[in-house]
């Protein structure tokens, strides 16, 4: 069986441990991850989905929870929104937090 998991921000060290282009460790996180869902909650939801035979789950809160629905309903709008966020410096803004 296969379970597709679409997670939002999960409170982990993944961002801190990420590598920069030069191979150095990023060493910082951002507010979205620092305030994300507890990993134990994510694991519980995944296990429950496996146990009950789900095929796909979204584990997200707030705006992140609406992204899969928007992608299904109007993918072009979603891509345009993400493109505008990136052009507006989204990555730099969350890194500065």
Put a short name on every predicted segment.
Residues 1-62:
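SDR active-site lid
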Residues 60-71:
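Conserved catalytic loop of SAM-dependent methyltransferase domains
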Residues 73-75:
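Short, solvent-exposed helix-helix connector turns and helix-capping sites enriched
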Residues 78-97:
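Non-catalytic terminal and boundary segments that flank Rossmann-like NAD(P)-dependent oxidoreductase
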